[in-house]
Amino acid sequence: MSRVRIVKGKIYEAVEGNLSYYSETDIIENASIIYSENSDTEILYGGNPEKPPMAEINIAADAIVHFRPMRNWKGKEYGFDWMRIKDTGLFGDDLYSDLTGTYDKYPSADPAARFTTSPTLFTDLKREYSNPVYSIPWLLKDRKPTSYYPSWICVEKNKKIKLSLKVHIKDKEKLPTELVIAYDKTLCEITTSLGQGVENEKSDPTKNTHYAKIVIKKNESYKLEDEIELKVIKDITTPEILKVLCDGNEAGYLKLYNNKVKRLNVVCVRVKANIGNGENKGSIKGKTELENYLKQSLIKTNIVEEDLNILRNIDSTPNTDLSLPSISNGSGINVGGNIRGKSLYDYLDEKLKAMFPNFGTDGKADGTGKYDKFLRLYFFSETAYLVHNGATIGVGGIGTPIGAGRGTMFSGITDADVAHEAMHAIALGHSFGTQESISAITPYLFKYKKTENVMDYAHLDSKDKYSTWKWQWDKLRNFNLLTE
């Protein structure tokens, strides 16, 4: 949101305390004659500006409605993200205030790593769901009002999907008269168990807003599973908001994410190689999981398959590059090693480009490759490892560096972990780490193996991982190989 203030004369501001200005983008000040600043002591300029404090608004309604995903949702139908407050019973739905934080050591490499919650990280995370934060004065926890956070959904235009609701009633002996979802009829269509949303000329004389009724029960808290059928019928480029009204007061929100579909070309490459233990060719897996994970942020994939035979050199002599001690121990590939100073990933890209070149008008290879603008996933049948602090650690796959557009998969990797490594190659870091892991790529960190997010390691505890967060959608949709 922007604000422009135009005056013909002078502007005077006088305050007894501090005066602060905050902006999410730029602050520009112009003067036609003189712009002056005076201070009794000094005027300071510096980087690393503070983030604006979060505003808080009390919800006046006598009911609260949370939007939640459909029953048995596993991320296949749409992307959905909400501030977890432990109200669904799903794995990963623990209080994010208890799960956001950092480790003193990298937890996947050191079981003795200790976790510390971070109120600062949690405060920053709140902004992804809502700013301002809404407060429910009558719903208390530890004698304090609880907070309300809108949920996010990313769903394709004209696709019908189902959503669930979680409802809290202030006083079950004094029930609300009406609980409805109010929405722009040109934005979406909504049907609940009480019927399709309709206009209400008294509430909206222009008849642009429709209202879908929600069941009111004589319970303090209840769940309405698969209560809503939603179809977005409009192109969304900036977030839209659906509001729940309780007797005219706002009682809940659902934010609709950008629904413009983006596309990603992917090439899955079976590598035929010999690292000194015989000729082997990799097998492709994980395509369905990758498609499902990316669909949550409305990225659709076009996946092709190729074979890359690097058994022999151009002169037909045996290619022994991958048996060099700098890249292999004879039974597995060292993902941190090199081939005459070249990383494994650069080496594979070079071989792929040589096998599938683009040609200029003169019929000669022009130096570019057919798959340069594809996400490139290489599959080996060999095992792999890395050396960390003198210890050899087995590796199923790796997508590095983050956002580089290529990943390498090895023997033993699961379908879900192929997609996990591909997400590294596109834009995402792990969901856990140390203080040093926090960056523009990974602004938030969580407790290890405690979320269902695809960038966690919950599978090591036999838990499903299948979801992505709204802030991850932002990262994924900015990948430089995407097309529209």
Summary of predicted features, one role per range:
Residues 26, 263, 374-376, 451-454:
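A residue-level signal for beta-strand positions that form part of recognition/binding surfaces
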Residues 242, 405-484:
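The catalytic-center signature of Zn2+-dependent metalloproteases
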Residues 58-371, 381-387, 392, 477:
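Propeptide-to-catalytic entry region of secreted or membrane-anchored zinc metalloproteases
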Residues 1-57:
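Right-handed beta-helix
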Residues 374-413:
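Active-site scaffold of zinc-dependent metalloenzymes
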Residues 14, 30, 245, 267, ...:
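Residues in well-ordered beta-strands of folded domains
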Residues 362-373, 394-403, 446-449:
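Extracellular/periplasmic catalytic domains that process cell-envelope and extracellular macromolecules
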